[in-house]
Amino acid sequence: MEQLMSLFPAISTLFTQDPVISITRIALIIFGFFLSYFGFKRTLEPLIMVPMGLGMIAINAGVLFLEAGVVGTIHLDPLVSEPSVLVNLMQVNWLQPVYNFTFSNGLIACIVFFGIGAMSDISFILIRPWASIIVALFAEMGTFATLIIGIKMGLLPNEAAAVATIGGADGPMVLFASLILAKDLFVPIAIIAYLYLSLTYAGYPYLIKLLVPKKYRGLEVEMDFPEVSQRSKFVFSVLACMLLCLLLPVASPLILSFFLGIAIKEAQIEPFQNLLETTLTYGSTLFLGLLLGALCEAKTILDPKISLIVVLGITALLISGIGGVLGGWIVYWFSKGKFNPVIGIAGVSCLPTTAKIAQKTVTEENPYAVILPLAMGAGVCGLIVSAIATGVFISTLFLLN
């Protein structure tokens, strides 16, 4: 029997661990398979779901007996903080250096923001600023509503604020905020945030169809806008970066990363732009998905606060989606029907996913209607508003403490 346990330690641990943990491991292995498969089918976002699903499978399947009979893996241990233990683990766990040097300090979030900035077009923010701002503000409804609900449900203000940032649908922002506001809940918040952000890919089209009648979904919008010069966009990015860093220094790492990406694009520094748009963006997204999957250990998922975060996370994204579409309707009414209310969903700043969802939903009703540029503008504005909301949360809580 001992020889069999030595030959197949991963299977053996299923019988030696607490039955609840063993069952959870099996459930997570199955769940990881479905995440990766639905990523393959493009039902969910493949860039995150395929590596996340495989990471989830490996971390829960590849459990073995370590020193002194301790059960664990040689992938990653996010709970270690003792320096001497951490140094030893970095020589054993292959993902430990990646986690500690890029994930737990928010660096990976900043790298992703570099790429988002380099791929963002701010022309439509400058051409129609009020339309983008109104949509973006309403799309933050979920963030502020969930903060209040979270506190009412027993979370501490800092914990509720960290969970509430899921409502902005901005993954890197959620990582950054939860690290500062609620480090002990960082892992479950990050996992749930990215799971839900990928689920918006599948769920938001139904929300749009529920809130926007068919005859309005195919509305064409005027696309004959004046051209915005690269100089104007460059100057805007520099001034916006300066102003937001002055007002919200706690969020300045993400603000700098995003606007530097825009500035590099508008200055046409092609070597940097190619680096940010391809190598850094896709490399960081790969490790982000893989690490999120590797963090889905059974012990982590069994945290009693997980169920509350699950409920609050989906509440935040649902209210934000409703708020965004409501903002779209308000702009439609004020513009006397010259704005497609579906664009409102793009104010939920999961770039570029929500903008693509908006365009796809409109195309189903009218193949000739093009709203993607306006939707991207609303999404970029939503990202900026999300950064402001996060900065306000962090600054206010620091002041209260």
Swiss-Prot record:
GO MF assignments: decarboxylation-driven active transmembrane transporter activity; lyase activity
Subcellular location: Cell membrane
GO annotation (BP), single: sodium ion transport
Reaction(s) the record says it catalyses: N(6)-carboxybiotinyl-L-lysyl-[protein] + n Na(+)(in) + H(+) = N(6)-biotinyl-L-lysyl-[protein] + n Na(+)(out) + CO2
Organism superkingdom: Bacteria
Membrane-protein topology: Multi-pass membrane protein
EC number(s) from the headed UniProt entry: 7.2.4.1
Predominant place of localization: membrane
Residues passing through the membrane, by range: 20-40, 46-66, 70-90, 107-127, 131-151, 173-193, 244-264, 275-295, 306-326, 380-400
EC category name: translocase
Keywords, alphabetical: Cell membrane, Membrane, Translocase, Transmembrane, Transmembrane helix
InterPro entries hit by this protein: Malonate_biotin, OadB_MmdB
Protein name: Carboxybiotin decarboxylase
Species this protein is from: Malonomonas rubra
